């Protein structure tokens, strides 16, 4: 299988489509003809904080590594060598080819996901693999010995209307892109999240991973609200047809 063919197979495997739902999403501002007015002001919770709740996706999420475009990675030599090895081997060890989680921040960049916000906790539900993430906003500190996992351990605090989320405790197995840009278990991820208006969010990501990169670097995500639909169940192993073909060179 060629590298391009294998990449297309993984992307088809890993990007489910959201369902057309029989009912309109309540609480969304609409025009006179019933269309969602996504430029309306961002909603707020009773305490005045921005409310990130809703179903979100990136319009260009089905292209490969768009959020890493034009970044000059400050590679550690070992991470650069690992990246080149993955490319040379046609990305055959991509975790998604084995129906494993995407991890962060790739899941936020590529998956349609639902944010459920409460005063002390934000839960993110991802359609791909029916995975989830918790962001604790109850004032707790980021632990120094979190149990290693695909999605890490996340705590958040408010700086005005910006939610600042700090995450660690990653297992280092996830890829940042389909091409194989690596992270390690030393990753410290910082996300600065703003809901610009009702239908648009801006997220600044800072990747601080001294095992993989010589200095921190940043990129951005700009998800859009997906109205009038809901998540559907997506069980990767029930649909998986491609892992047997991911044999590399």
Segments and roles (model prediction):
Residues 2-3, 9-10, 15-249:
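PEST-like low-complexity, intrinsically disordered acidic/proline/serine-rich tracts
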């Amino acid at each position: 299988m060629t590298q391009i063919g294998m990449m297309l197979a993984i992307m088809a495997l890993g990007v489910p489509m959201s369902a057309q739902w029989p009912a309109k999403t309540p609480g969304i501002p609409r025009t006179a003809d019933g269309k969602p007015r996504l430029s309306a002001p961002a909603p707020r919770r009773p305490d005045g904080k921005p409310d990130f709740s809703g179903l979100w996706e990136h319009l260009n999420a089905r292209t490969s590594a768009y959020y890493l475009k034009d970044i000059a990675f400050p590679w550690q030599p070992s991470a650069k060598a690992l990246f080149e090895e993955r490319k040379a081997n046609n990305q055959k060890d991509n975790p998604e080819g084995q129906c494993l989680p995407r991890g962060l921040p790739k899941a936020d960049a590529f998956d349609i996901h639902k944010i459920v916000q409460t005063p002390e906790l934000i839960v993110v539900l991802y359609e791909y693999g029916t995975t989830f993430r918790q962001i604790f906003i109850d004032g707790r500190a980021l632990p120094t010995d979190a149990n290693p996992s695909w999605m890490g351990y996340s705590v958040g605090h408010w700086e005005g209307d910006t939610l600042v989320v700090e995450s660690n405790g990653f297992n280092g197995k996830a890829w940042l892109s389909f091409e194989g840009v690596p992270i390690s278990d030393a990753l410290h991820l910082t996300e600065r999240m703003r809901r610009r208006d009702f239908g648009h969010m801006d997220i600044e990501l800072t990747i601080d991973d001294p095992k993989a990169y010589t200095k921190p670097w940043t990129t951005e995500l700009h998800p859009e609200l997906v109205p009038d639909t809901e998540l559907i169940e997506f069980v990767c192993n029930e649909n998986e047809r491609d892992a047997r073909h991911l044999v590399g060179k």
